[in-house]
Amino acid sequence: MNKQSYTAMDYIENALDVIQGRKSIHPSFSLCNVAEKQVAYVRDILTGKNKDKSKLHALNLGAMAAKEFETTDEELARHLSNVNYIASQMAQGLKVILPHEQDNEYLKRQKRYRN
């Protein structure tokens, strides 16, 4: 799929796919279970299945990406960071700027992952 046509849901579904792949290898790894629940919650908010946005402020996907997966599973860290980026904008009631769109904060974060 062309990055320019990506939607917030594409980022979330991709993250869930990666998490489920990791869970198939390590089914009892609790961090993957926590990440999956949090990403699924963001998906449910985005689709309207869940209307309670109060938990968006309590998500720790970004911290999980940086502290737990950045050095051991860069792909999963990138996906969690993308979902965290989307969720943090949703929590603030902002129009969501997707990670691939030109945004200085996103570009800084991507440089950090490449180095």
Predicted feature residues:
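Amphipathic alpha-helical binding modules
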Residues: 59-115
